[in-house]
Every structure is written in C-alpha cells, then in structure tokens.
C-alpha cells in the first residue's frame, strides 16, 4: 500500500535551525530521544579529541596523557553534581554501563537485615521492576507495588515506606509524568529509617531541578539520554556508599591487598562502584554533553521554551485526529498513544518509510501497560533538542494521512 504520493527530498536544515545537529538531514525525523538522544557536535568533537590527542588510561598512570584523562574525569563528576544540585561533601559520582547496571550495582550490594521491605511503583521501567523483584527475594523481604497518581505522585502511607528500600522513577518514560510528591516522600522515608533510590534516566534533560530539591540516597541515570555517549551514572550519598557490601570487585579498587583481604583507596571512594577499566571516552563525552546542555539555546529559545512549544504542538495536533487515544493528560516531550484504526507497529513501519523514527510497543514498561492497563501496543513520540516545528508538522501530517488512508 502506497499511502504517500511523494517523498520528501533529502536536504539539510540551516545551521540556525539545527545548530549543533547539522549532520541530521531534514529527511530524517528522529523521535526516539526517550530511548537515546542524538549526540551534538561538541560531544563528538570531545570524544574524537580524546582518541586522537590523549588516548590513555586514567586513575593508574603518572604520564601526561593519563593526567589529562584524570582531570577530565573529575571535571565530569563535578558537572554531574552541579546538574543535579548536589554537594561533593555529601555525594559521590560513579560511572557504570547504563542505568540498569547502576541500579543493580546499588541494590545487589545493600547489606542484609537492615531494611524490612522494598517498595516500587506500578509505572516503572523494567530496569527498576526486575531488579526490585530479584533483590527482595535475595534479602528475604516483602516487595510492594504502589500506585502512581495521574500527576506522577506516589500513592503511599507512612507504614508503606517504614524501613523500606524505595525505588521509583523521577520521570516516566511513557508519558513524562514526574514524581510530584518527591520531597514529602523523601522526608517520610528518611524519618522511618528507609532509603530512596531514584531512576533518573528521563529526568536530567527535562527537569533536573526536581532532583536538586530531593535528598535522595542514590540516583541512577543514562548519559545516552542526556546527549552523551552510552554510559550509566550513579550519584550516591556517601553514607549509603560506605554501607554497601561489595561483591562486584576488581581492577582499580586496591590500596592494600593480601591473600584474603583488600582495602579500597581512601582518596577515591567512587572506585567501589567502578571495578575495572572505565569508558574514558564516554565519561569525557558526558562532560562535554553537560557543558553543552548548560548553554545550548535551540532556535534562539531556552531549552524549556523550545520543548514546551513542540510538546504543545504535538499534543494538540494528535488530539484533533480521529480515533486516537493519548495516554498523556497534558503535553510532554514524551507522548504515547494508540489508534483504533491502525496497529502501533504497523504505524511505526509506515512512518519509517517516510524516514520518521518513532518507538512502538511497551517501552520496557510491560507490567503497567500490559498487566495493569491492558493497553494494545503503543506508539511513542519523544522529542529532543534537535527537533523543530517542521518535524512536528510533518509527523502530524503523515500520521493523519496514514489513519485516513488505512480505512
């Protein structure tokens, strides 16, 4: 079936329209930033510079290239703390494979017989839902799945969080709803001897101010959703880090060692979550991404203004189409929906033929979308700082053509 009469010709937007994404042609409309954001040119440049100019190991050498790596890594740690509004006196920053790995690192090394229950919510990514399942069994404690309100708040009682390991997302990857009662939740958890671990994978580029207002015990997020390379980051309170019973150990973690014991370097606490050689290019790329995020103005607007404008266009445009069911109750840069007229996977394929890249399925949130809500597969449109008004108008036009012609 040929739904479209003609295809867009391949061309490039002007530098003022795409700025640091000039390598993205107008023919390509990428709408999967909730999975992985595109990398702006300064990030690519920083990584190439590392590979070409000082491609060495960090943390273990005395020569100049290695010292440059060490300085760049520490600069990135400082940039992470600044982005989430935390002090190096209270928190450490460690680099891992991804958000999932970071969450597993923390959860699987928590001490036994300290916490009496584990709490998560129904609208969690599998990177939270599965590890909380396995760690509750490992620690022999009950696991409770709580509801989230429409505004993203966690619905709980004080008994629910007493002595609890609470692991929830700060921002949903389905519809962008945020943990509105995060501060009250954190107070209740800490007053009852519990800990709060946040999945911040979707938060760093949208509303990092929420993270700054919450005294979380650990935060895990992904560089690759923050305009950096594929990398995970853990921001952890020193007190929690010191309590971990380490089982993921190896190179770069030794101050002293004998046949049956070892001690960690006193001047590098984060090494307890960083066994082995690190992805130095990735860490340097993340530092460049955070520097870029601090100053980038898409189409002359603030990032928030730009994102809100496109999100409203997308939400209002889809709302006008027939037989479309939008999960979002308000505009968001992450928007999910389904159509009565065309299956989400077919819709994604039709869009792909027009070089529009959108995600279809359940977005690793199977429990909430399939078990709780019993939705059919969904289509998710997630906007990034590279997107333009033209992108949104084109997508809305093409979705309308598909729905009209598929009947």
What are these regions (language model features)?
Residues 1-407:
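Pyridoxal 5′-phosphate
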């Amino acid at each position: 079936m040929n739904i479209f009469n003609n295809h867009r010709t391949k061309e490039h937007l002007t530098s003022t329209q795409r700025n640091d994404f000039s390598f993205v042609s107008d023919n390509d409309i990428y709408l999967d930033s909730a999975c992985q954001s595109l990398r702006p040119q300064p990030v690519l440049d920083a990584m190439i510079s590392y590979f070409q100019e000082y491609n060495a190991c960090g943390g273990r050498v005395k020569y100049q290239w290695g010292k440059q790596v060490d300085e760049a890594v520490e600069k990135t740690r400082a940039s992470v703390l600044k982005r989430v509004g935390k002090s190096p006196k209270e928190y450490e920053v460690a680099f891992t494979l991804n958000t999932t790995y970071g969450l597993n690192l923390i959860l699987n090394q928590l001490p036994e017989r300290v916490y009496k229950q584990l709490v998560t919510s129904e609208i969690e990514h599998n990177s939270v839902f599965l590890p909380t399942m396995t760690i509750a069994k490992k620690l022999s404690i009950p696991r409770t799945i709580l509801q989230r309100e429409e505004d993203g708040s966690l619905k709980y009682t004080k008994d629910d969080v007493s002595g609890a390991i609470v692991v929830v997302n700060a921002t949903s990857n389905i519809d962008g709803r945020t943990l509105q009662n995060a501060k009250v939740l954190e107070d209740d958890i800490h007053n009852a001897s519990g800990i709060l671990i946040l999945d911040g994978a979707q938060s760093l580029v949208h509303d990092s101010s929420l993270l700054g207002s919450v005294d979380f015990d650990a935060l895990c997020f992904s560089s690759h959703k923050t305009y950096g390379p594929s990398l995970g980051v853990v921001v952890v309170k020193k007190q929690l880090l010191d309590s971990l019973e380490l089982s993921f150990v190896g190179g770069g973690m030794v101050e002293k060692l004998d046949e049956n014991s070892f001690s960690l370097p006193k001047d590098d606490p984060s090494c307890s979550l960083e066994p082995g050689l690190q992805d130095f290019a990735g860490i340097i790329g993340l530092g460049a991404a955070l520097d870029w995020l601090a100053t980038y103005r898409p189409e002359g607007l603030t990032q928030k203004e730009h994102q809100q404008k496109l999100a409203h266009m997308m939400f209002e445009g889809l709302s006008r189409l027939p037989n479309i069911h939008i999960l979002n109750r308000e505009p968001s840069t992450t928007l999910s929906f389904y159509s009565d007229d065309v299956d989400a996977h077919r819709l994604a394929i039709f869009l792909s033929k027009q070089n529009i890249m959108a995600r279809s399925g359940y977005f690793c949130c199977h429990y909430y979308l399939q078990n709780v809500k019993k939705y059919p597969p969904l289509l998710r449109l997630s906007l990034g700082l590279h997107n333009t008004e033209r992108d949104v108008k084109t997508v809305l036009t093409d979705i309308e053509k598909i729905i009209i012609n598929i009947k």
